[in-house]
Amino acid sequence: MRRFVSLLLTVFILLLPVGTWGEGEPVEVSASAWCLTLPGRAEPLLDKKGTEPMSVAGLRKLPAVLTLCRAFDSGLIAESTGMQVSPHAASISGPTAFLESGERIEAGELLKAAVMISAGDAIVTLGENAFGSESVFLNNIQVTLKELGIERTLTDCLGTGVAFSALDLCTLGAAAAKSQHFCRWAGQYMEHIVHSGGRETELVNANRMIRSYSGCFGLMTGSRKEEGYTGVFAVKRNDVVYEAAVIGAKSSEDRFAAAGSLFDYAFATFQPVRLTGAGEVAAPDWPVLSGDRATVDLVAHEDASLLLNKSAGKVDRRLDVEDPLTAPLYADVTVGSAVFTLGGEEVFAVALYPAADVASHSLVDLLRRVGRSYLRTGG
């Protein structure tokens, strides 16, 4: 039996060499490692040392922030929940929200700082309060990594000393892009948090691309003198999302230029091709034998699109459906497929269903109905 796949923008026909960077690659990127990905595609569109684990500066905190955002998304943490800052959390160095030991502050305020500036004190405070202890929080972060297929072991919740590959960052970024709470703050350039005593701390997102690159909605940046400038970015245009990770750029400007070059390449090279929409009629008035109606519309149950190289040519369609169909037919049982081809080669198939049930009017069914009627009336 044909296996049908109907996923929005997750099946891709890419008619160009993709994978490892080398001489003659169509983009020039100044960084130690990088990759360009499309969520749902296992292999990167382009990469240089994309699977090689490296130090990623502040992005080592991304698994913790993602775990927290998922907890907010699921309702485990409410934004209005008051949380107390421990001496340990208040002692965290690096980018911070300037929290003070013993201070009480709402979880929603802490989340802003965790996402926008990777504030270590806010991350630890959220983790300690929401999960009961840092060790339990760390266990939950490890679960997040395992679910995403990232085999890394963290020694603390902030990821001290951990190495991630560019592809790891894109995988984490793809998960973060699905989080409502993460995206809410990752796309904000400037905000502030209000402490319990009325004191305010201004937050400025270091990701300049959310203001300078059309469609960029995040995700996170980081830098350290010895590790360079790192970032994972996501851009959405025309319902297509690309992600890029850059590790070890020499400057902030190089980091953003690298990501911009990768996105420019993607939008210049690929185009989405819409195939079907959920509930859309793919074949009107398809003939039916022995039914209580002579025809039925055939519809797709899912959205389906391809992402093609702009030079790929025209996508053609044929219907792989018995003509005519024979009743009975059921709206939840597939009767065939719409098959899409490129250059004569099948590239995608979408399952088709009757738009409505069609009862059978065959002689056998007629005799059965007569028999049932006879029994109901007592002969």
Question: Which residues does each PLM region occupy?
Answer:
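Intrinsically disordered, low-complexity Ser/Thr/Pro-rich tracts
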Residues: M1, L16-E23
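Sec-dependent signal peptide recognition
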Residues: R2-T10
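Hydrophobic alpha-helical segments, especially transmembrane helices
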Residues: R3-F4, L62, R237
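Generic structural signal for hydrophobic residues
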Residues: L9, N140-I141, N205, L262
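Hydrophobic core
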Residues: L9-P17
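Residues in and immediately flanking transmembrane alpha helices
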Residues: L15-L16, S74, R274-G277
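Active-site-adjacent loops and short helices of periplasmic peptidoglycan-processing enzymes
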Residues: T20-Q180
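Domain-terminus/edge residues, biased toward the C-terminal soluble/receptor-binding domains
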Residues: E147-E151, G161-G379
